[in-house]
Amino acid sequence: SYDAAALVELLHTATLVHDDVVDDANERRGFFSVNALWKNKIAVLVGDYMLSRILLLSLEKENTDLLKVVARAVREMSEGELLQLEKARHLDITEEIYFEVIRKKTASLIATCCEAGAISVGNTQYQECMFLFGEAVGIAFQIKDDIFDYGSDNKIGKPTGIDIREQKMTLPLIYTINNVSQKDRSELLNIVRNKNEDASSIARAVDLVI
């Protein structure tokens, strides 16, 4: 179980380091991100080093079953990130695509954590059940986190409106665009496309969504 926990935590940390590079984020949980301190080149190498530790630890412990599910999670998260980046260019993400993105980007990691727990104690008969449980938890977590981005900075404890700045089409924005007047829809899309760096425009978009 300790080996499984180490593997998934190394994976989690590596993905956070790489995510901060992709998102050009300078903070992570109230502290400077790796790329903010040592630039993108070092951050990418740090993330890669952690992934290499997963491979070595798995081989040293002969945990090929754990390595298989961790490798699958890396593939899923990478595909999810690429899908989100590709769709962000055209702002044409549907609810169906949104759920596919968060299933791959977020839920696959939590699903792998749960599945790895079952594998580590030899309960392979519960492996699929634990995976599906973790996937459901991951999807719920990401939806809640996306809703928080349209809340109040003071209540949430972190900056809001980040998804608009990064042109991320999350569920609150997708739902609003599909259910408002043509005028408000055009205004929202214009803000996301052209005014996503302007604080007052972002505040206006948040108001339209909530």
Where are the regions a protein language model picked out?
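All-alpha prenyltransferase/terpene-synthase fold signal
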Residues: S1-I210
